[in-house]
Swiss-Prot record:
Primary residence: secreted
Organism: Corallus caninus
A GO cellular-component term linked to this record: dendrite
Protein name: Neurotrophic factor BDNF precursor form
Cystine bridges: 119-186
Record lineage: Eukaryota, Metazoa, Chordata, Craniata, Vertebrata
Keyword list, A-Z: Cleavage on pair of basic residues, Disulfide bond, Glycoprotein, Growth factor, Secreted
Glycan attachment sites: 99
UniProt-annotated location(s): Secreted
Gene Ontology MF, one: growth factor activity
Length: 192
């Protein structure tokens, strides 16, 4: 019977506070404040998250809990989308562009300014069948398990890997380098 919705209200009941349990909620007469904006709702949720000063300490049995990586996923099938971190970054860029005037947005577009990546790259999910070793967050090379045992069977381990594209400028050197005077090449490096 506990209500666990965050924020000041919902679209079904504008302005209704959704804290407490179902018996303590007031009737619809108290919900006359009007519909709160989506930005206000997000602002309140973010304030709640920032106000919480609790530091989560891993228990003794889960001491490796801080070794989580956003580029690794356990799943029975290939993930359909990139990791959440990359999606959030794209969304942030979208919001930044939405706050600009059309003239500023047009002139800040990387394609319009002639900005290109030095090397072409591709990003994809790979399995341990394709990747036998990996570099952990400490910089040590570790052996990768192809399948991870779980109570209801086994899950495959997927890694989101970004590497130099085999086609394009990789053979001719990097973009923006004067080929008459300098030699350059695009190489995949480890980053974490």
């Amino acid at each position: 019977k506990e209500v666990s919705i965050r924020g000041q209200g919902s679209l079904a009941y504008p302005g209704l506070r959704t804290q407490g349990n179902l018996e303590t909620l007031s009737g619809p007469n108290d919900a006359t404040r009007g519909l709160t904006s989506l930005a206000d709702t997000f602002e309140h949720v973010i304030e709640e998250l920032l106000d919480e000063q609790q530091v989560i300490q891993p228990s003794k049995e889960h001491k490796d809990a801080d070794l989580y990586s956003t580029r690794v996923m356990l799943s029975s099938q290939v993930p359909l989308e990139p990791p959440l971190l990359f999606l959030l970054e794209e969304y942030k860029n979208y919001l930044d562009a939405a706050n600009m005037s059309m003239r500023v947005r047009r002139h800040s577009d990387p394609a319009r300014r002639g900005e290109l990546s030095v090397c072409d790259s591709t990003s994809e999910w790979v399995t341990a069948a394709e990747k036998k070793t990996a570099v952990d967050m400490s910089g040590a090379t570790v052996t990768v398990l192809e399948k991870v045992p779980v109570p209801k069977g086994q899950l495959k381990q997927y890694f989101y890997e970004t590497k130099c594209s085999s086609k394009g400028y990789a053979k001719e050197g990097c973009r923006g380098i004067d080929k008459r005077y300098w030699n350059s090449q695009c190489r995949t490096t480890q980053s974490f």
